[in-house]
Amino acid sequence: MLEALKPAEGATFTYIKGRLIKQQAAVENPILPFPIFFLIKQNKVFLIKSFQSSQKCEFCGDFFANSHTCSVRRRDFYFHHINFKSSEWWSQISFQPIGSCDDTKRFFLTYDVETYTWHGKHGKQLVPFMLVFHLSGELELVSLSANIAEQQRWLAWDTPHTYYYVSPIKGEIGKAFKDLRYEIQKQVTRLLWDNFVGENPELAEIQERHHVNHIDDITAEMHKIKTKGSPQFIEIYVIGHNICGFDEIVLAAQVIHNRTDVLPAFKINRNFMPRNGKILFNDISFCLPNPKYEKRKDFADWECGKLTAADHKYQFVKFMVRDTFALTHTSLRNAAGAYELPVEKGSCPYEAVNEFYRIGSYQQDEDGFPSLRYWKSSEEYQLNKALWREKNVGAYDIIQQTLHYCVQDVLVTSALVNKLQESYKNFIASQVNLPDASFNIFQRPTISSNSHAIFKQILYREVRPNKANLDNVLLAPSHEMYDYVRQSIRGGRCYPTYIGIMEQPIYVYDICGMYASALTHPFPSGQPLNPYERALAATEWIRKLENLEQKIDYFDECLLPGIFTIDADPPDELFLDELPPFCSRKGGRLCWANEPLRGEVATSIDLITLHNRGWAVRILPDERTTIFPEWKCVAKEYVQLNIGAKEKADKEKNQTMRSIAKLLSNALYGSFATKLDNKKIVFSDQLEASASKTIARGNFSIKSSSFIETDNFSAEIMPEFVVTYPPAPSAELDESDENEEHTLFIPKDSHVTYKYKPITFLETEDDDICLHTLENNSPLIENNRYASHIASFVLAWTRVFVSEWAEFLYAEDRGKPLHQRTIKSVYGDTDSLFVTEEGHRLMEQRGKHRIKKNGGKLVFDPKNPSITWLVECETQCEKCKSDAFSSESVFLAPKLYALKNTVCTCCGHVGKGKLRAKGHATTELCYDTLAKCYLSDAQQGSQRFHTSRLSLKRTLATNQSNAAPFTVTETTLTRTVRPWKDKTLVDIDGHRLMPYSKSNPNPRNNDVCWMTLPWNM
């Protein structure tokens, strides 16, 4: 059009999704003396009369000509919902009450396996030869499962509903267990379907309308009708102790079988999540519509933790794998003791069993009992031999004895399951004051996930948001903000400041419930401020930080909580000490150093800590800088409930309640620090349509694929045969042919030599045994579950505790060179400090109010805000419980040290010492060995020290050729014991170590720093 009109100047403006796209027209030989401009909007063409320049408000996104006024509400809305980048930075955290429906039917299949070592192509692989299981829970489901077990010829034990199977054939145990679980799954889902069909006769009309042969063939898409009847909720738990890291892996190739004969009417949801060599989730749900489902409008029940049948969109049968180890974090014997369960004495010589299956025999003593070498000690050998003689069962049958102990473990685990369920339900009802919640501890797989759910429930009850999320009280950082917040999470300190043998007395002080105390302190809450309000709040921070002479109060009401990008410079080295207030990863390793900090991400608490320790802190401009509108003690009630329950349990001698309160108190911090990634592992047949579309669009890619080793499946081996284009069959030889002389065979150029091998047909589909690792092509992580910034502030509060501790020890040394100061501490762990006699004296004097035995608070009081933490002397006398010290100690490296003994300061009793050797077999080490190791290294001796231990390599999904998915292999791990070589501190005199500083910088730090040279200014 413009070409036809030929104006002096012409252009077309197209309005698309809030943007104007200009297309300039090139006009040759113009006729009209004036310009013409068109606007295309919503498929309509407008003639532009005139242009007027406008401006866009960077805070609210509005356009204006001359002047403009925007409100805080509009700025917040634009920042959190409109701006294409910041609108994805913070997500609301979804909420569901911790309770479950009262009508839920639960069935538990508790099992354990025993294995022997099989030498295969992937190394020493552990193969199950025995499996025992016990049935408990809903009587109808127990009876059904018992009938299935008997039909499949599982052998019954003397205890009711207890069955076992023994076979050394590789793969047979797993196949039998798979068949059992599969048949239970099939029959229980049939129960749900029959009930659904009986209460919905309209399904017969759907069958006729869609010309379906049988009502069982109706698909989920067909029965989208308004259903009737009472929903059923059935949960089936496959449970064992420490099975997710072992038993479920060696059986998984058999039991993870997804292509089943499940009726097409069911909607199937699967949740399979391997993590850190363990199967964290292996759940599958078979769902049908819930006729009572209603979208909730009144959330009063949710505040009480109550979940009703109307809250579930589907009625279901759920199959879940749960591990009692993930809920107790200790061995089965210790867990039984903690929850006051009876445990039979004795143990099994598993190495003898292993030899029996491997070579057919094992060493025996003169009575036919397994030799002493199979037992941990002579005492264990004598005890078990005495128990065997008491039973008077004749000759020692190693398989029968193994079966007996396996059955006992299963029965103890089953009793533990019942105890955990009842105890946690009572704890939530009485201690958390949620009697209507009907809490089920096995609904979530780990103690961390349960603690997080309880925390959210308590917070939801307090804030009452009246919606299905926590509103803006607590948000989750996502996308770019997730990575930014994760940069502010700094691990705990762990390093010695003295290497060698220390002949001075050493006391060990430990912070009491460090994370629990930190969690009671205030944390940032509310929707982060928009850039305009953020700049105003940051100005107040800058003003306070510029005054280096004035310390800042941690609870200054003028300063809002936030996360900043900072530079910081330390004071003169004479005013530094061995406990730096902050750490950095700039050199590739986490170092607690007194070096200048550049471009570090830190919480507002860290800014105050650095400032109060004499550091000059500068806030750097960063669009990701986050400032929150208020402080709030979001976790105080949760921690206070657990501390109160623990103290009450101590008074009442209730070991069960004490164990629960202690576990829940310690587990919450870890849930906030959960690290997410962009990967997920699925079986090939689990790729739903939505996942396939994301792969097709390029949003996800298949990072790797691997197959479960086929040896684990049952198979039929066919004789040799040719599949395609076989060579022509040879004609029968006649007599004349037999007498002919054989001539030299010269092959043709095109000749191929065929070697025919047996073909094995597996009883499985390829999709069932193929694992895909899917990875999001975007590096940004979507998070709507965890308030990760809470973990940052928890760790920041713990650094405040240690910073105050440093003041007790080192304040009097300010102004002295570091190498001339008296040694006051020699080792620092995350929540403990090893101090000398001088350090102990200062703790008793300057830090007296922080020692637990002198009284003090563990829970922060918002009405009288002050830093709240306590310590106690961990080295105590075994007899009188007074403070004790180690007369001699040796420190080799982080988490590698030994205290020779503990000498009581009151009664003089000499007790046993303490040894820590992470990654080593501690049974092979003692104080003298570590001391010899140090002396040999210091004197450049030739003696070398090693420890060896058996290690289990767990493989779930891999693209490595030397490892098969779903296998556990046994390897011998040998490690060298030696003093610290790659130190992250400066060696002063061969013994003392000091943090890096300006005069002794970190040699690993190769970051480039741009600066202007003075002569170029």
Curated annotation (Swiss-Prot):
Its main location: host cell. GO terms for molecular function: 3'-5' exonuclease activity; DNA binding; DNA-directed DNA polymerase activity; nucleotide binding. Its EC number is 2.7.7.7. GO terms for cellular component: host cell nucleus. Signal peptide: none annotated. One of its GO terms (biological process) is DNA-templated DNA replication. Gene3D superfamilies: Helix hairpin bin, Palm domain of DNA polymerase, TPR 1 domain of DNA polymerase. Pfam families: DNA_pol_B_2 (PF03175). PROSITE patterns: DNA_POLYMERASE_B. It catalyses: DNA(n) + a 2'-deoxyribonucleoside 5'-triphosphate = DNA(n+1) + diphosphate. InterPro entries: DNA-dir_DNA_pol_B, DNA-dir_DNA_pol_B_adenovir, DNA-dir_DNA_pol_B_CS, DNA-dir_DNA_pol_B_mt/vir, DNA/RNA_pol_sf, DNA_pol_palm_dom_sf, RNaseH-like_sf. Keywords: DNA replication, DNA-binding, DNA-directed DNA polymerase, Host nucleus, Nucleotidyltransferase, Transferase, Viral DNA replication. It is an enzyme of class 2 (transferase). It is found in: Host nucleus. It comes from the Viruses. This DNA polymerase requires a protein as a primer. Heterodimer with the terminal protein; this heterodimer binds to bp 9 to 18 of the genome. Forms a complex with viral pTP, DBP and hosts NFIA and POU2F1/OCT1 for initiation of replication. Belongs to the DNA polymerase type-B family. Eukaryotic-type DNA polymerase involved in viral genomic replication. DNA synthesis is protein primed, and acts in a strand displacement replication. Assembles in complex with viral pTP, DBP, host NFIA and host POU2F1/OCT1 on viral origin of replication. The polymerase covalently transfers dCMP onto pTP, thereby initiating complementary strand synthesis. This is DNA polymerase.
